[in-house]
């Protein structure tokens, strides 16, 4: 029973690493947190994350921590309460591997210029990284962290597979 949770800002290999893990481990990928979901209200948000916490042998591309970051950044988004967050963390602590993927702001901005994004712009990256640092340092679960400016997606995927096997 494993829940692999990939967190981090845009352009930090979350989807790429998720695809590589899925191929190797045969785990499905679930999109955990999204801008659309964040507009649905607190109860629906909690219900969604609570249901995801019951899953086993899946890869979640963004989960509760991304919600906390983006709901603080974009004020009209729903956010989990501290109590709801701790409830979910308690539920998954025995099976979750929380992976925080990040990079230097200049690396992310360069990748963002190449890829583009309908929600996030280069000017948002510094504040998003700061919020991630705050949120991830307050996470109630052990977190594994990789700088995607220094590690390739292949290296990160191999390391995560080593952690879960």
Swiss-Prot record:
One of its GO terms (biological process) is dUDP biosynthetic process. GO terms for molecular function: dTMP kinase activity. GO terms for cellular component: cytoplasm; cytosol. InterPro entries: P-loop_NTPase (IPR027417). It comes from the Bacteria. This is SPbeta prophage-derived uncharacterized protein YorR. The lineage of its organism: Bacteria, Bacillati, Bacillota, Bacilli, Bacillales.
